[in-house]
Amino acid sequence: MKVLWAVLVVTLLAGCQADVEPELEAQEPAVWQNGQPWELALGRFWDYLRWVQTLSDQVQEELLSSQVTQELTVLMEDTMKEVKAYKSELEQELAPMAEETKARLSKELKAAQARLGADMEEVRNRLSQYRGEVQSMLGHSAEELRARLATHLRKLRKRLLRDAEDLQKRLAVYKAGASEGAERSVSAIRERLGSLVEQGRLRTAALTSQPLQERAQAWGERLRGRLEEVGSKARDRLDEVREQMEEVRLKVEEQAEAFQARLKGWFEPMMEDIRRQWADLIEKMQAAVGTSTPAPTQKP
């Protein structure tokens, strides 16, 4: 039954009017056609929406029933559980980062989670309202109600596309920020080391100008030993920073691959079930049409 109502949501999101389809194609990012695996799966999802639009408008009315609110509630709860699980994984990945960065990212994730819940709640309310109006008609024709619903859902599609693009931009900013932070750390160490070397050079020049040659040589040896010690510590610190950045990079890549695999595993079975449901439904409808068509009468 969940798959059946997923088909209902897909059909309504696809729109009931053919003239809204060019707008959808114009808004779809090109990266969904040749990007990461989860983006490719999302591209196949939108391709399937365009295919669903070619089906009969009567499919929507046949799928409506009194259980639509309950089924959508179950789907919403399952989706929010997945969002919370992914949020927990991100919090574990952010362990090596600064507290300020972790707090900012956690706040933005909570806001995105709230927007997602509000979007799904709006879809459920629109479908419930549409079902009630279809049953009572409220003085409107079915085409008028369908056009109103298509307008609301078209606005919702724009909002979802905007949120997806905003998420991609935020991920790019975080990636650039991490690289920039690592570069700043290395630059700061280099500047500090250069300052120590310059101070040592000035002190050596001052010592060599003293009349007592032995004292100058002693100070020079001590200074060189100090510089070598500082240089060794700086190199060790640089190596440690590089190792930490490499560990963070590997963890992020591993989590990203796992999430991409999860998205792929979620989308592809859903699409396969939807295709199977539609094939059975179309076959039943064709069989019903074939049996209900009266045989032509012969003229005497």
Curated annotation (Swiss-Prot):
Record region (Lipid-binding and lipoprotein association): 204-274
Region LDL and other lipoprotein receptors binding, residue ranges: 152-162
Keyword Secreted applies: yes
Chain segments carrying region Specificity for association with VLDL: 262-274
Modified residues (Methionine sulfoxide): 137
Keyword Iron-sulfur annotated: no
Cellular compartment(s): Secreted; Secreted, Extracellular space; Secreted, Extracellular space, Extracellular matrix; Extracellular vesicle
Sequence repeat start and end residues: 75-95, 96-117, 118-139, 140-161, 162-183, 184-205, 206-224, 225-243
Post-translational note: APOE exists as multiple glycosylated and sialylated glycoforms within cells and in plasma. The extent of glycosylation and sialylation are tissue and context specific.
Keywords: Chylomicron, Endosome, Extracellular matrix, Glycoprotein, HDL, Heparin-binding, Lipid transport, Lipid-binding, Oxidation, Phosphoprotein, Repeat, Secreted, Signal, Transport, VLDL
Binding-site list for heparin: 156-159, 220-227
Residues modified to Phosphoserine: 141
GO molecular function, one term: phosphatidylcholine-sterol O-acyltransferase activator activity
GO CC terms, sorted: chylomicron; extracellular exosome; high-density lipoprotein particle; low-density lipoprotein particle; multivesicular body, internal vesicle; very-low-density lipoprotein particle
Pfam families (alphabetical): Apolipoprotein
Signal sequence, renumbered to the chain: 1-18
GO biological process: acylglycerol homeostasis; cholesterol efflux; cholesterol metabolic process; lipoprotein metabolic process; melanosome organization; phospholipid efflux
Predominant localisation class: secreted
Highest taxon, organism lineage: Eukaryota
InterPro entries according to UniProt: ApoA_E, Apolipoprotein_A1/A4/E
Protein family (similarity comment): Belongs to the apolipoprotein A1/A4/E family.
Known function: APOE is an apolipoprotein, a protein associating with lipid particles, that mainly functions in lipoprotein-mediated lipid transport between organs via the plasma and interstitial fluids. APOE is a core component of plasma lipoproteins and is involved in their production, conversion and clearance. Apolipoproteins are amphipathic molecules that interact both with lipids of the lipoprotein particle core and the aqueous environment of the plasma.
Subunit structure: Homotetramer. May interact with ABCA1; functionally associated with ABCA1 in the biogenesis of HDLs. May interact with APP/A4 amyloid-beta peptide; the interaction is extremely stable in vitro but its physiological significance is unclear. May interact with MAPT. May interact with MAP2. In the cerebrospinal fluid, interacts with secreted SORL1. Interacts with PMEL; this allows the loading of PMEL luminal fragment on ILVs to induce fibril nucleation.
Protein name: Apolipoprotein E
Species assigned in the record: Dinomys branickii (Pacarana)
